[in-house]
Amino acid sequence: MESLESVDASSGSVGSYMSKSVRKHWWSRKGYHPTGSSKNGSRLKISSDENFQDELVVLDDAFLCNVPLELPSTSNAQKTAAESFSKLSPQDQLLSLQLNNVQESVFQQSTFNLPDALLDPGPASKEKQAVLSIGRPSWLPPKSKEEEKKHMREFEQIKKSAMRYDRQKQKEKIKMVEQKNKRNLYLVNVWEREILRNWPDALKSSRYAGIWRQGIPSRVRGRVWEKAIGNNLKLDYQSFFNARANAQKREAAEKAEQMNNANQFREDVCALELDLQSTMPHYSLFHTEGPLRRDLIGLLRAYSYYRFDTSYIPGTSFIGALLLLNMNLTSAFNCLANLLDKPFLQAVYTQDTSSLKSFYQTFLDTLKKNEPELATHLLIKLELVPDDFVYPLLRKLFIPMVSPEIASRILDCYVFEEDSFFIQLLMAVFKLLKPKLLVDDSRLVLSALLFENWDLGPEDEFMHFVYDISLS
């Protein structure tokens, strides 16, 4: 390939189409000036250590960009050339085309890979452009003036209608936010001034029956949960610190052992670490460097050593994290211990399947009544049992699969209604996930139930759906 240093001004592969003035302008823009002509006056000399390929020269203000004239068929190469060419000024584009003797179409990229019926096959003539209609392909007959005016009026009406619709939707959204804030303020006043001051007598009034179903405001949620859970274990402020101190002592003792107890301890620690990695990953509060990470670990270890009859069971971290989002560490420990001491959750977290049989049977009877097709598919066709697809949900308290808002609403209702609420909740979830559960692969069914995030919609709508389900 020849270099521009040896190209003849009047002949040669480039000289045949590049004038001397164009070449001078090209070199002058780069700071090079001809030192003179050769003996025959036909050559333009430059510094001997500056040689450039003359395949395809694209100029800009900073440097020479050489792109091969024979562009590869790959779209990436064409895209690179087109992008380089598009950055040039109009004068530089013209100069680049003159230097390379190529057509501008080389740099033009097609917008669509496939032909489009609405794209013109070629540029319209000046005569056709004079009569073309707006928004109409050039190869079709133009509209009449009356029709074009009519369509323009209709277009303006459609545009105005769309703008009115957008404004209306924005007003509705603002109104919904205002109503939600107003309702939240009302509920805060009711809980603080009426219910908490007159606990528990106020809840017996028909005026406040089922008020927790509307959602407990986050401002008072922690205090309400504490009162609703109760304190049958008679724990106080020092209970957490005593449990944590005992945990540290027992941890040190078990580290020194070399037999079964030490192995069990290592298994518990491993299970705890695995659980922490999947606890509310959307909240940075519980990440490795999160501000609540240490509190959560301390809470779980203190509780696991507080209950000598059980080791750490996967799932405890989810409810522990939810409690820490709404109350301080000592209150969270007291609530966790008292909550998991209730008969139903105690059976869940100690894996006492015999105590869960009545709950399983009630749920299966309700499922067969409300969703017979789904019940037949899960129990007969896939041969699943409640321990496969119900127990893991109860152990996790549904928290990993739902949004934090819905998880809080679930605990709002459970602390007042206990295990009967879980029947309605399970039915609502199975109804909403029914299309994903009617597949023939049990692995996909279990994945949809136990490992995927559920799209249940806004929390208010979902909770209304839960309570609309009839259990009778």
From Swiss-Prot:
Residues 215-418 form the Rab-GAP TBC domain. Gene3D superfamilies: putative rabgap domain of human tbc1 domain family member 14 like domains, Ypt/Rab-GAP domain of gyp1p, domain 1, Ypt/Rab-GAP domain of gyp1p, domain 3. SUPFAM superfamilies: Ypt/Rab-GAP domain of gyp1p. One of its GO terms (biological process) is vesicle-mediated transport. PROSITE patterns: TBC_RABGAP. Pfam families: RabGAP-TBC (PF00566). GO terms for cellular component: Golgi apparatus. GO terms for molecular function: GTPase activator activity. InterPro entries: Rab-GAP-TBC_dom, Rab-GAP_TBC_sf, Rab_GAP_TBC_domain. This is TBC domain-containing protein C23D3.03c. It comes from Schizosaccharomyces pombe (strain 972 / ATCC 24843) (Fission yeast).
